Amino acid sequence: MIRAKDRTIDVYKRAGAEMRLLKSILSKVTVDVSKVLTATETDKLIKELDRICLICSKAEENMFKDYPDLSNEYTDVFYGALNYEPRNEVDAEIIETAKRVADELFE
């Protein structure tokens, strides 16, 4: 983990966008690949997704500890679907950042 003074809100937003993208992709992959895997094998993917959600929870906890005055809208940094209408400005910003992150994978 980087020092507290270097953990800017923008660092959290970027990490949140990346985590939301990862969870979205893994959720879709789990559904799609479950058609060719046994239930036991699919359960392994589901457990990994659960682990990632726990990591998001810890990251969110750190964010609110570092920035205690953030509004409740900032729960959207680490949580929420990427393929729906944004719920608020923070959600919209994170969705756009996730799109940029995805595009960077193809550069």
For the regions a language model picked out, list residue spans one by one.
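N-terminal acidic leader/helix
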Residues: 2-32, 36
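Function-determining surface determinants
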Residues: 3-5, 39-54, 85, 96-106
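Acidic-enriched, low-complexity/disordered segments with a strong bias for Aspartate over Glutamate
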Residues: 6, 10, 32, 43, ...
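Generic structural signal for well-ordered, non-transmembrane alpha-helical segments
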Residues: 13-27, 43-57, 80-84
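Charged/polar positions within long, soluble alpha-helices
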Residues: 24-38, 54-68
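Amphipathic alpha-helical binding modules
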Residues: 67-107
